[in-house]
């Protein structure tokens, strides 16, 4: 995910944390997400920004064939490195309305999404 593509800059994240309250909801697709309900029904999103973020899970960074959370989470690599050994990743989860950013080892199995620069 390109940080600037959707107006989500470094100052909004304040390091490695959550973005604004509804950023995740606005990026998630309206379908394909497992419901989550602890008094609130998050699950899928509104796709307000047209990103259509689909749940797809991830493969853990231990190199095992553990692949999980296919209908509950979605992870994408950023094109930006946090350090020599870590790269930024973004994730959406069925139990959060926010977009999460954290630095992870490149051996983690996350999705890649090619984005066209806006004209």
Range-by-range predicted roles:
Residues 1-119:
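Conserved positions within compact, well-structured domain cores
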């Amino acid at each position: 995910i390109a940080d600037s593509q959707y107006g989500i800059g470094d100052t909004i994240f304040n390091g490695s944390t959550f973005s604004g309250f509804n950023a995740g909801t606005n990026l998630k697709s309206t379908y394909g997400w497992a419901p989550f309900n602890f008094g609130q029904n998050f699950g899928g999103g509104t796709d307000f920004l047209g990103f259509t973020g689909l749940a797809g899970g991830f493969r853990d960074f231990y190199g095992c064939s553990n692949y999980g959370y296919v209908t509950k989470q979605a992870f994408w690599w950023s094109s930006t490195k946090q350090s020599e050994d870590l790269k930024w990743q973004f994730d959406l989860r069925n139990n959060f309305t926010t977009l999460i950013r954290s630095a992870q080892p490149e051996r983690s199995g996350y999705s890649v999404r090619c984005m066209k620069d806006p004209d």
